[in-house]
């Protein structure tokens, strides 16, 4: 083998290795990415059953029904006419209650309109919510300022206060 052929073989092997690595990373990301939806989004563009997504909004007031064991059913709403029924088995976060912001993650059960969640995250303010989602909830009048957070103008815990002379 000549020197040029060896160099070409090394370059081709390196390119093949890089291509394989990129394809493996893309496959891994496609398996772990979960797109964020709100109930109004799901009404416009339904998601195929068994597609992993994140569903966010507010827990419907009076919709929390505790079943046997640690199974809980509740509705997630964003003010649209179609709240989404969610079923979750596990320990709920302390901040979870009706009217509170929530993000659930998993998929719709095949043949039903029930979202079976394996993760439930309770939110107490827009710090943990995408800005556009918080803005949509505020524009619909569903977001209550100061809910779960210190009122504006109060000094946050841990911040230094500078005295003015």
Swiss-Prot record:
Query: Which residue intervals are topologically Periplasmic?
Result: 29-165
Major location (coarse)? membrane
Q: Which residues lie on this side of the membrane: Cytoplasmic?
A: 1-7
Q: Where is this region: Disordered?
A: 139-165
The protein's GO terms of the molecular function aspect are: heme binding; metal ion binding
Q: Where in the cell is it found?
A: Cell inner membrane
Question: Where is there biased composition of kind Low complexity?
Answer: 144-165
Membrane-protein topology: Single-pass type II membrane protein
Instruction: Name the positions where heme binds.
Output: 124, 128
Q: Which UniProt keywords apply?
A: Cell inner membrane, Cell membrane, Cytochrome c-type biogenesis, Heme, Iron, Membrane, Metal-binding, Signal-anchor, Transmembrane, Transmembrane helix
* Transmembrane region(s): 8-28
> Tell me, which GO biological process terms does this entry list?
cytochrome complex assembly
A single Gene Ontology CC annotation of this entry is: plasma membrane
**What is this protein's function per UniProt?**
Heme chaperone required for the biogenesis of c-type cytochromes. Transiently binds heme delivered by CcmC and transfers the heme to apo-cytochromes in a process facilitated by CcmF and CcmH.
- Family per similarity comment: Belongs to the CcmE/CycJ family.
Q: What is this protein called?
A: Cytochrome c-type biogenesis protein CcmE
- Source species of the chain: Rhizobium leguminosarum
Q: What is the lineage of its organism?
A: Bacteria, Pseudomonadati, Pseudomonadota, Alphaproteobacteria, Hyphomicrobiales
Q: What gene name is listed for this protein?
A: ccmE
């Amino acid at each position: 083998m000549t020197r040029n052929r060896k160099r070409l073989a090394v370059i081709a092997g390196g390119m093949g290795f890089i291509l394989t690595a990129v394809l493996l990373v893309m496959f891994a990301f496609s398996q772990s990415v979960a797109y964020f939806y709100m109930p109004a989004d799901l009404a416009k563009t339904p998601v195929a059953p068994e597609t992993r997504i994140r569903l966010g909004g507010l827990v419907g007031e009076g919709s929390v029904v505790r079943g046997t064991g640690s199974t809980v059913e509740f509705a997630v709403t964003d003010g649209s006419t179609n709240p989404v029924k969610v079923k979750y088995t596990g320990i709920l976060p302390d901040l979870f209650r009706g009217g509170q912001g929530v993000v659930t993650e998993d998929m719709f059960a095949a043949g039903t309109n029930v979202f079976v969640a394996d993760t439930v995250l309770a939110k107490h303010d827009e710090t943990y919510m995408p800005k556009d989602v918080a803005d949509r909830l505020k524009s619909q009048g569903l977001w209550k300022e100061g809910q779960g957070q210190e009122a504006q103008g109060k000094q946050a815990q841990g911040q230094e206060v500078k005295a003015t002379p």
